[in-house]
Amino acid sequence: MRSQVRWRLCWENELQLSDHIELAEFFRRTYGPTGAFNAKPFEGSRSWAGARPEFRAIAYDSSGIAAHMGLLRRFIKIDGADLLVAELGLYGIRRDLEGLGISSSLRVVRPVLQELGVPFGFGTVRPALHKHVARLGRGGLLVVKSGIRVRSTLRDALLDKPPTRIDDALVVVLPVGRPISDWPAGEMIDRNGAEL
């Protein structure tokens, strides 16, 4: 039987060092099984991998952190057209609670997105997660788009790598203040920053 989950909604500057330490450990345990490289950004007390979120939804239960979703408002470009979005990312859920699901996190974050006045929530997921996120699309919560390339800056400027990378990821769009029909058509999204 699962313990009761309670959500904490907080701005980034409300987190204490102890929160970052606990979150970093959560991400190392969550992302580590998918490869040591995926857990590496969370060494020490660093609780973000690429861009740092401005707002977090953190679920707790009797065992500690159960789930996390970060958001960051930013302007992206879709084939050159500017669009304000709230990027959703840095999603994680403890393995013993995987049935809690991303839909629960989105339901908690949606009122925050409405308060912030953004037209869309936006995120990317790797193609291997297509079946997982497609279920959410069937429920009308979001739309999954494929065939769109996404350009992002690297977190760090490195001497041996270009400053940007291009991914063929699945694009997840959550209509918030505008209908999905207002999402611009296009084949290239410029994130204009590091992935959340």
Curated annotation (Swiss-Prot):
Cellular compartment(s): Cytoplasm
**Which effect does the record note for changing Q16E?**
In strain: ORS1096
Q: Which domain of life is it from?
A: Bacteria
**GO cellular component term of the entry, any:** cytosol
One MF term in the entry's GO annotations: acyltransferase activity
- Span-the-membrane segments of this chain are none
What Pfam families does this protein map onto?
Answer: NodA (PF02474)
Broad class of enzyme this protein falls into: transferase
Keywords annotated in UniProt: Acyltransferase, Cytoplasm, Nodulation, Transferase
What the entry lists under PROSITE patterns is as follows:
NODA (PS01349)
The EC number on file is 2.3.1.-
Q: Does the keyword Ion transport apply?
A: no
- Coiled coil located at which positions? none
Q: What does this protein do?
A: N-acyltransferase required for nodulation. Acts in the production of a small, heat-stable compound (Nod) that stimulates mitosis in various plant protoplasts.
Protein known as? Nodulation protein A
Taxonomy-wise, where does this protein's organism fall, top ranks first? Answer: Bacteria, Pseudomonadati, Pseudomonadota, Alphaproteobacteria, Hyphomicrobiales
**Gene name on record?**
nodA
